[in-house]
Amino acid sequence: MPKHFNTAGPCQSDIHYMLSPTVRLPDLKALIDGRNYFIIHAPRQVGKTTAMIALAQELTDSGEYTAIMLSLEVGAPFSQDPGMAERAILDEWQESACVYLPTNLHPPRWPPSQPGRQIGAALASWAKVATRPLVVFLDEIDALADETLISVLRQLRSGYNRRPRAFPHSVGLIGMRDVRDYKVKSGGSERLNTSSPFNIKAESLTLSNFTLSEVEELYLQHTQATGQVFTIEAIQQSFYLTDGQPWLVNALARQATQVLVKDITQPITAEVINQAKEILIRRQDTHLDSLAERLREDRVKTIIQPMLSGSDLPDTPEDDRRFLLDLGLVKRSPLGGLTIANPIYQEVIPRVLSQGSQDSLPQIQPTWLNTDNTLNPNKLLNAFLEFWRQHGEPLLKSAPYHEIAPHLVLMAFLHRVVNGGGTLEREYAIGSGRMDICLRYGKVVMGIELKVRKEKLDPLTQGLIQLDKYLNGLGLDTGWLVIFDRRAGLPPMGERISTEEAISPGGRTITVIRS
């Protein structure tokens, strides 16, 4: 079977394009050689499981170690019953060992032991009879919680001093969150009698996104296998859109090569990558859908809502910010502050949040189109004003984020517009005081800026300056500035909507819409 780009589960080197795990985790071999216990944490679907399965295989094939990746996930339903969790986990481990290890390296039958001791007893018995030093990577450690998580961590700590003769030579805990957060899931550090729930760890490592050169290396594997070329611009665009997030990098390439350009004599261009991006965002595959589900959690909403509106981040618990970082939903900008992790997520988040408003939209005739189906900006303005007068206020209730409900309803309307053959692009950031939208429909390009007025000071002057800069980047001479007035005691938004023309500092004609 020819190799392809993988988006479902761990990669398998015989059928998937993939990067070497030793390249992605260059310091890990030295940690293992030094009999260290360690943590590897990273967001979901960045290749943790793939890398560790491949590394275990490399270590075993070298003849130096018996190395294996084992999962703890089957113990997740038994958070209050360590005994049941241990039995489920150990059954899974026996099956995995039969699949991944040669017969002469299989573990013995697990010895009988009391609940709360079975994991440690099994690892001890295996280490004692192993003909090579035993290296174990325990995946999905943060699937466990409460009593079961405490029990597993304590058993590993208890056996640590007996390594390597009577306990594994090296153990790696693999999960989404860092060790500092295990105590949160286990009910607090006082229940572990230590300030750290895993104080035997030597290092806490993370698996980073692909670099630009790694994206190029991955895509080059396809070129070498098929002859189909990814242009330099396509590789750069893929890296820009994904920030190197491995699932997204693979997903774009999969769409490009298996759906959009099946003819291997034709190159994959930047335009093809952009088309692949639109398909992914519209489809919202499992990876994107799982992130979207998180948006309704209060600790996520508290941080994402001000990012969308351009407000300052309120006082939030450090653990909430770390949670979003560990999810891979946001990242720390080199310039300071939190930003959405990559441009694809930046598109997905407002689309998902405006979906409820989209589903609540009444049937709207596309009166914004000319007879030749081109977009008419003046007709679009009139259609929006009429829509807002009739439906704006009721639709605000359908928006999941109250503070930016007007933004979401406006975006729902604009999505109805571009569904006929256009695109929306958004820019937003903490503390920017705005959201910028670029609407493209055929040859028509429109720049729109959204601002919220919460205080007496009118944001018009600042908005004109900001919109001027945005329109300059788009090469446009006109744009919309939409100001949503959220001060108390005002008439309904639909009743007070108005428009006026203003000239920006750069001499551009701006349509100011107030509501």
Map each language-model feature to its residues:
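Active-site metal-binding core of divalent-cation-utilizing nuclease and nuclease-like domains
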Residues: 416-443
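Winged-helix-like regulatory helical subdomains adjacent to P-loop NTPase cores
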Residues: 213-216, 220-327, 333, 364-370
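Nucleic-acid nuclease catalytic cores
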Residues: 460-464, 468-499
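Conserved catalytic cores of phosphodiester-cleaving nucleases, focusing on short active-site segments
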Residues: 437-439, 443-454, 470
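Mid-core helix/loop region of P-loop NTP-binding domains shared across ATPases and GTPases
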Residues: 92-151, 161-170
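Walker A/P-loop-proximal flanking segment of P-loop NTPase domains
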Residues: 1-46, 50-59, 121-126, 383, ...
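Conserved NTP-binding/hydrolysis module of P-loop NTPases
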Residues: 8, 67, 72, 79-103
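The catalytic "switch" region of P-loop NTPases
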Residues: 8-10, 148-241, 259, 263, ...
